Amino acid sequence: MWRLVAVALLALPLGSSIALAEDMKLPPLRKQPTQQAVIDEHMDALNKCDWNRLMAQYPADYQLNLPDGVVVKGREAAAKIFADFVKPHDQGGLCGIKFSPEQTLVVGDTLNIQWNAEADFLAEPYKGSDAYETHDGLMVAMVSTFKGSDLKMKK
């Protein structure tokens, strides 16, 4: 996001995401067999703008820490954030961004990733880092440098 995501989402209007998330039923949790599988599923779901697959990874106590002291707590709050992210770009979302890992470091149950994000609507690639905390086959926390207002869009 990867999970870079949420701050970009902060640059998007949240009103429509709240309505969208309320209309969308949270999918059942789907545990992955390994720490790497959790991250691979997250990245693939994010890159494919698959809200259901994203939400199947986050338990009720999920926490996302973003720049500027923004903290998203809980599965329902994350659902609202990601609902905007997966919308097509022409509808105010960021669907179309592809996150590619450039460097990975595992420390215990935390996977630290430096990534590159590119999209047809971006004027230049965007780089960032995320730390993913996994437990029992789920993503329980993420710390991300992703900040949507820093994306340079094509005019």
What is each stretch, according to the model?
Residues W2, P125-K155:
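Short beta-strand edge/turn micro-motifs at domain boundaries
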Residues A6-S16:
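Bacterial N-terminal signal peptides
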Residues A19-A56, A60, M153:
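Short, low-complexity N-terminal intrinsically disordered segments enriched in polar/charged residues
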Residues W51, L64, F99-V106, S144:
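Hydrophobic/anchoring residues in structured secondary elements
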Residues Y58, W115-A119, T145-F146:
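Short beta-strand segments enriched in hydrophobic/aromatic residues
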Residues Y62-K73, P88-G92:
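A short gly/proline-enriched turn/hairpin at secondary-structure junctions
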